[in-house]
């Protein structure tokens, strides 16, 4: 039992971070304090503030502390530790994806493209957008309004005539001389920039002025083009929310909570434009106060490695925050400018907050219905297999094209649904092309021949295939030499029916040595189909990426001494990949940056291919 009195005698009154561990040496809670001794002492009073705290204290085996120079530093360290340890009594943000931006590059003929990652390329970044779909929609809209190129430089540099985008009026063809002047092209780039900045009226004023000027010059064809562009821009503006206020860059957050599930709705507004919204479903311990949830979410959302998320000037929330000033100070330091957190707003900001609240409740209701359906299906599967509970299920599938670029997938489910952070793909190598049995053996060996923690051992392993696939899987498990209990998982084959139609699947249960034909309306079958389809889609998407990579690689990447710059030079000076392959040794050696020795290596490699 943890001796709190003895522990507290050595705790400092300095600011810092504390980590609480259970008897398995797992971090179960991370917290921070202005005064460590005062804060930690509060956990061991007779009357604790909540049932959550009571459960936490009952699980403590030992506590570690880390001193910091300030409370702000402690706040940052706390969020880093939460991300590292994922403690079960902390609120956990389960979404750690970076966010996409729109990038306006800095080059002679600037291009507009989507970008995700650190801002390492020169140019202007607009965003972040809530998801890739919002970026694609905006890029498609920009193409219709402003004929600015969106193609890759490798395409742009090797054009001898305009592409289809020019033919349909979505690019002005700066890649080919004589179609558009630099001045005209830069005018359209500037209009696109103003539009992305939310300066719609400036765009309209400019276009109206150009239309009137063209009319005065009797250039009615050009005036008509400006008229059409004005109508297109106005049509877009009319569909957008019109605000009488000048809205700053801001994120608006609202939380809905019901039946142990929380939804945080985040609305992104940049330069006066609503870029979209996104729902988050953080893992919330029972009996967590919603103000604590909001506070923790804000910190994790912006501070955990940034994840490509830009910190706006203003963050609007619908809960009072106890540590508002500390969060503002830390976010301001991270952003390099003043960042404010607003808990009470009026006007259009209030309307946006109400909209976020409505969306949060709607998204939560959808999630609750999905969770309810998942729970019913999960229980039906438990009943079917005569199992008291199923903690973890894994499913495997193989994908290839004529035996090439073979990829195996593993998807993971628990009673709440997919555990996408645990999904894995495996490259299959060293087998006869198209041998799915050998591929299944290899992926199972890769997955299970290593040590597994207790909570990572699956209760059920679904094999997408019939008796042949299942027997290979059983053979792999029979020969596994591992410390964990390899007899625990139930191996189940999911064979397609006679007509290979959904709903006619046959379950082959290895431990019970029986086959089950389930009716179309079986909830257990619906769950198995969901898991199987998820595995199938995961395998196919991985295979397509691998196939596309093999298709687009030029062969130059594998040659020692040929990096990205030399590859670009070869393609540029010799007219693309076919030009490089047809080039003589002397022609390759004439490319800037290519030595005679390297030219010989390139020539021999491509000749042998």
Swiss-Prot record:
Presence of the UniProt keyword DNA damage in the record: yes
InterPro entries (UniProt xref): GIY-YIG_endonuc, GIY-YIG_endonuc_sf, GIY-YIG_UvrC_Cho, Hlx-hairpin-Hlx_DNA-bd_motif, RuvA_2-like, UVR_dom, UVR_dom_sf, UvrABC_protein_C
Domain GIY-YIG: start-end pairs: 13-91
GO biological process annotation, one example: SOS response
Signal peptide span: none
Keyword Cytoplasm carried by entry: yes
Primary subcellular site in the record, as a coarse category: cytoplasm
MF annotations from Gene Ontology: DNA binding; excinuclease ABC activity
Subcellular location: Cytoplasm
Domain of life of the organism encoding this protein: Bacteria
Functional description taken from the UniProt entry: The UvrABC repair system catalyzes the recognition and processing of DNA lesions. UvrC both incises the 5' and 3' sides of the lesion. The N-terminal half is responsible for the 3' incision and the C-terminal half is responsible for the 5' incision.
Assembly and interaction partners: Interacts with UvrB in an incision complex.
Family of this protein: Belongs to the UvrC family.
Record protein name field: UvrABC system protein C
Taxonomic source organism: Haemophilus influenzae (strain ATCC 51907 / DSM 11121 / KW20 / Rd)
Upper lineage: Bacteria, Pseudomonadati, Pseudomonadota, Gammaproteobacteria, Pasteurellales
